[in-house]
Design a protein with these regions (language model features):
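C-terminal amphipathic helix plus adjacent low-complexity
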Residues: 313-350
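Donor nucleotide-activated moiety binding/catalytic core segment of transferases
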Residues: 73-80, 219, 223-259
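A conserved, positively charged/aromatic
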Residues: 108-110, 118-132, 246
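A nucleotide-sugar donor-handling region in carbohydrate enzymes
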Residues: 129-198
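Catalytic donor nucleotide-activated moiety binding site of glycosyltransferases and closely related
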Residues: 47-60, 102, 188, 205-237
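A donor-sugar binding/catalytic signature common to diverse glycosyltransferases
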Residues: 88-99, 109, 245-282
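Catalytic binding pocket for nucleotide-activated donors in carbohydrate/polymer assembly enzymes
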Residues: 265-316
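Conserved nucleotide-sugar phosphate-binding/catalytic loop shared by glycosyltransferases and other
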Residues: 7, 24-69
Length: 350
């Protein structure tokens, strides 16, 4: 089978990498298309993948630029799929769905964002896609008949214990020792981030002071510029090692929904300070069913301080959250193995 993947974000690469390797081992042909996005291309190069970059330059954020880039990606995916003689197209972007529809080939959309969060992307994608492979709680609106639900999360495709083992020696090699809190600041510039608030400089300073007063070191992983007062707290590591650092943190304080899910997969307590609170079904399930993460809206900074103090005062916090993680893992599947089986047996498994 000729299987074409399109990747528009580093997290999408992590999601498919273990399945893609297994598909190749099983004798299938795999082609990977990407666009330039953060560390995505570096990850593929370091792992030795062959790929084609169909959008090498960053686009502007104006609506016309977004639509133009989307149209060009669809055209590029269409041409690449024809040359490759793709039997199936897989990815999150609307270009996969639209190209598959034009070629009359199965197009599989993989995501875990609810339709209310990605409304515009859903409008460009769901009418054309063949199936939507998503975690069971993920809402897809009127396209429910296209949904293939699974008991898991996209982050389990690479952070499941079958694929990832945290290594404390990697953390120590950076001179990170003792108890520490990781603060993650996201850029919040994606189309679905419009109007969403997060952690501001003033509040981050207060959180750093609070965790230090409680005997913890503070490290900041940031996609945004830091002020001079916070720059000394910047986490300086190789980007591939972030999950090891996250795994051994006493707490994650973040306005990144993605890293909050990753923390839950690793059993690291997390507080997500974001106006997405209550709007993302995957995170709500992780909070309500497993108590692995806690959401607080941005108009409640005092609540953030209180929850931080509560978690850092727990004497058995690591053991407690690892037990919660084990409960979650016992009820979820190996997502990478599921994706491999889904593709190899398509359309029987759905």
């Amino acid at each position: 089978m000729n299987i074409l993947f399109y990747l528009g974000h580093p997290a999408q690469y992590h999601f498919i990498k273990n399945s893609a390797r297994q598909l190749i081992e099983d004798g299938h042909q795999v082609k990977i298309l990407i666009k330039t996005k953060d560390i995505l291309e570096s990850l593929l190069q370091e792992d030795g993948w062959e790929y084609e970059n169909i959008q090498p330059n960053y686009r502007k954020n104006a609506k016309l630029a977004i639509l133009t880039a989307s149209f060009k990606r669809t055209l590029a995916v269409l041409k690449a799929a024809r040359r490759f003689k793709a039997d199936i197209l897989i990815g999150t972007d609307s270009s996969i769905a639209q190209a598959g529809w034009l070629l009359r080939k199965p197009a599989i959309t993989t995501l875990e964002d609810d339709i209310e969060v990605i409304g515009n992307l859903a409008k460009l994608t769901y009418p054309f896609t063949t199936h939507i492979v998503a975690p069971r709680p993920c809402r897809v609106g009127k396209w429910e008949k296209k949904k293939v639900p699974y008991e898991g999360y996209m982050k389990l495709a690479y952070l499941h214990p079958n694929y990832f083992t945290p290594d404390e020696n990697i953390v120590r090699d950076y001179g990170i020792e003792g108890k520490y809190v990781l603060i993650r600041l996201a850029k919040l510039v994606a189309h679905h981030d419009a109007g969403i608030g997060g952690l501001g400089t003033s509040l981050v300073k207060k959180m750093v002071a609070q965790v230090e007063a409680m005997g913890y070191k503070a490290y900041i992983s940031s996609e945004v510029d830091l002020c001079a007062d916070l720059e000394p707290y910047r986490l300086s590591i190789h980007y591939r090692d972030i999950h090891h650092v996250l795994a051994f943190a006493s707490l994650l304080i973040s306005d990144s929904q993605s890293m909050s899910v990753e923390a839950a997969m690793l059993g690291t307590p997390s507080i997500r300070f974001s106006d997405f609170k209550g709007r993302i079904s995957v995170l709500e399930e992780l909070e309500e069913n497993y108590q692995l993460t806690f959401g607080i809206k941005t108009d409640e900074p005092e609540k953030l301080k209180e929850k931080t103090a509560e978690l850092l005062r727990m004497s058995d916090v690591r053991a407690t959250f690892q037990q919660r993680r084990q409960k979650m893992l016992s009820e979820k599947i190996d997502v990478a193995a599921f994706l491999t089986a889904f593709i190899e047996n398509y359309p029987e498994i759905r």
